[in-house]
Amino acid sequence: EVGFARRNFGTDSNNYGRPLAVGSHRLGLTEQFTGELHGEFLDNQQTMGLGGVMLLPAVGVLSGSFAASHSDKGVGRLVGLGFRRQNRSFSFGVNTQIAGQRFVKLGMQSEELAPKHISQAFVGLATTDYGSFSARFTHQAFRDKEDNVIVSGSFATQIGSLGSVSMSVMRFLSGDTQTVFSLNFSMLLGNRTA
């Protein structure tokens, strides 16, 4: 991909700046292992990364990544590790990314510091008669502001032929603790619309 970096994303529209080139290549090297190469190139910022996903039969999926960047801040590094297991009714996983202070990538502001780490754990359960449940824990550790610690859970089920309902709750445990609830209902209006 070749284009221009977006400026003030989320606040300005049609505001583009530096030219950039981004590329990714993923290749299945064996039946169990897939490798990936990713690069981001701007005039004063370059980032290259390697990643891999390995299927461990009867165990789960293990993933790992390493990236290095070069910019006005210097040379920065990032490493990521993850594991997930999933079957028809139960799933769980953990993942983390640890970055050096000088690491940069697309989407970061020039004055922004990379988080020390972003770690997540999740669990999910799908039942035939009682719907599906999930829970997630997220911890984002920053260098220049307070950490984010978030716990969330959700439930979804079908209500006969009437429709489906989903509920979720998210609790922010750091800073000004807040709780967010959501409730959604959807029903089929016809053969092709919902």
Where do the PLM segments sit?
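Flexible, glycine-rich linker and terminal segments associated
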Residues: E1-A5, E40, L55, V59-A194
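Conserved, compact domain cores that house catalytic/ligand-binding motifs in diverse enzymes
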Residues: V2-H70
